[in-house]
């Protein structure tokens, strides 16, 4: 059995992805980046067909094809997401399967911005992708430089329309295909693109630096010691002596102090984002904490019942509904670790939502849940997933 390579944390890690209209060159650019960086000893070259034949992944009950490639620049380690089909992009961005810190928007100079260009920018804005770098592709196929200037202006205007700093966004012009074919001038353009990404997209705050949050999956009692809540730490860190709040499913917030921490039946000094832990809570009875609540750093998250969500609705081939739904539809919303019934109100002008649609609507839950902008959820009906989304705005 070959030994697994150890992941060395020497450079800061950033998640990015390519977005843009079909056939504008997203996958070609992804291949070009790995090829050029491989020449510089910073990546393994991935060819177009490897990236395009993306494996299927299940994310919260939804099948998505996504290609993940990794590479390094002089300063950073990147995980780069590329998805073959338009529907895969939508699902990827909405379900948060690929949490992007920044994106490279690919626009073909031959076409200019197209419908999916707009849709991807809107989605990037909705799901909190704060930084976009533009790659104007296929510039070798446009004879008139003024046309390229025009396309750049259109892209900048479109970004401004969706609250990105259109005037300041970096725009790199080149030909991904030529770079992939080994044209030295275009390979330098790819290097310049990656230097720009390095500089323009800031290193994200690490999950461990954020306030502590752990969705409760299970609760049990240790005789003589008290109540233990277990789950996977979503963000932040926790140690013995920390004060925590138990939030959700009721308007009352219980306060407690962590008196013990264990992982894999061993005591633990510090639990951090990603760890599955059991947290022993001082002065809390078995009935004061339940699955579906969260343990959180005091004051860091509140309960809400009403919110707007950006949602992808599964089509019937994906195991979703066979029929549309209307306002007042009442499915279960699965947040953190539990289902809560909610009533959907569609936006004005939207009569109904068809399977396969991507839509923003308002939800009113029957119980308060610990949520904030960016919280992920799935929509379920009779135990099967019919949609997935995330909170875009809190309304109460």
Curated annotation (Swiss-Prot):
What is catalysed by this protein? GTP + H2O = GDP + phosphate + H(+)
The record ties this protein, via Pfam families, to:
GTP_EFTU (PF00009), GTP_EFTU_D2 (PF03144), GTP_EFTU_D3 (PF03143)
**Residue span of region G5:** 175-177
Gene Ontology molecular function:
GTP binding; GTPase activity; translation elongation factor activity
Task: Name the positions where Mg(2+) binds.
Answer: 27
Q: What is this protein called?
A: Elongation factor Tu
Coiled-coil regions, chain positions:
none
Q: Which organism is it from?
A: Lactobacillus gasseri (strain ATCC 33323 / DSM 20243 / BCRC 14619 / CIP 102991 / JCM 1131 / KCTC 3163 / NCIMB 11718 / NCTC 13722 / AM63)
Q: Where is this region: G4?
A: 137-140
Disulfide topology: none
Give the CC-aspect GO terms: cytosol
């Amino acid at each position: 059995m070959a030994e697994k390579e150890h992941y060395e944390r020497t450079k800061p890690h950033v998640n990015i992805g390519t977005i843009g209209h079909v056939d504008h060159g997203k996958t070609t650019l992804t291949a070009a980046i790995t090829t050029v960086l491989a020449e510089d000893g910073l990546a393994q070259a991935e060819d177009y067909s490897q990236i395009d034949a993306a494996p299927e992944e299940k994310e919260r009950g939804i099948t998505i094809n996504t290609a993940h490639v990794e590479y390094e620049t002089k300063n950073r380690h990147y995980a780069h997401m590329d998805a073959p089909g338009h529907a895969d992009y939508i699902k990827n961005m909405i379900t948060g399967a690929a949490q992007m810190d920044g994106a490279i928007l690919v626009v073909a100079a031959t076409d200019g911005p197209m419908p999916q260009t707009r849709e991807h920018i809107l989605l990037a804005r909705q799901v909190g992708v704060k930084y976009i770098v533009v790659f104007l592709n296929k510039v070798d196929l446009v004879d008139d430089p003024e046309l390229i200037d025009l396309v750049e202006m259109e892209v900048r205007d479109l970004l401004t329309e969706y609250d990105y700093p259109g005037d300041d966004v970096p725009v790199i012009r080149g030909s991904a295909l030529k770079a992939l074919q080994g044209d030295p001038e275009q390979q330098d353009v790819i290097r310049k693109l990656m230097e720009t990404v390095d500089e323009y997209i800031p290193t994200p705050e690490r999950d461990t630096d954020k306030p502590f949050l752990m969705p409760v999956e299970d609760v049990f009692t240790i005789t003589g010691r008290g109540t233990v809540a277990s789950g996977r730490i979503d963000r932040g860190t926790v140690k013995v002596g920390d004060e925590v709040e138990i939030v959700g499913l009721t308007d009352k917030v219980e306060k407690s102090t962590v008196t013990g921490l264990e992982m894999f039946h061993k005591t633990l000094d510090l639990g951090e984002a990603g760890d599955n832990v059991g947290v022993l809570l001082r002065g809390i009875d078995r009935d004061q904490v339940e699955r579906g609540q969260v343990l959180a750093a005091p004051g860091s998250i509140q309960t809400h019942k009403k919110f707007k969500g950006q949602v992808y609705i599964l089509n019937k081939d994906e195991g979703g509904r066979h029929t549309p739904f209307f306002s007042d539809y009442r499915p279960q919303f699965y947040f953190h670790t539990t289902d809560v019934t909610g009533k959907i109100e569609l936006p004005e002008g939207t009569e109904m939502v068809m399977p396969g649609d991507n839509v923003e609507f308002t939800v009113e839950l029957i119980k308060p849940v610990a949520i904030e902008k960016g919280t992920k959820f799935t929509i379920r009906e009779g135990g099967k997933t019919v949609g997935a989304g995330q909170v875009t705005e809190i309304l109460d």
